[in-house]
């Protein structure tokens, strides 16, 4: 837990900064949904999604390359994760970040119907997969379980939302 908390602090700090981009457009997206036609909404959504992918993709690559050197410098070599664990942490960061545009539009436009059971399914799947994978892959298995549960539920369900 102590090792992960260092990575969680750093990844969470980057996530908070990038999340402000989408927090800033939430009201405008709500107004867009109330005043514009479906074509314009889709165009703005695709632009926001593209920007989100670039921002979170660039940040994920930077985190992958810079997390271990920073943790070693700040906390010491004994607090390092293997590169494979850092990779899956960065993949989780990227996947969750690329969902921000969809979540912003969903929240602003009230499109909650499609994912009403998603949280329950994702939590159950995360628990089962993490328990199964931790036996073979230790810490990496827990993060792989989280990644797989996100891919198998959130990404799939959020693609059903018609923006």
PLM regions: where:
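Short helix-kink/termination motifs in transmembrane helices of multi-pass secondary transporters
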Residues: 24, 48, 52, 61-65, ...
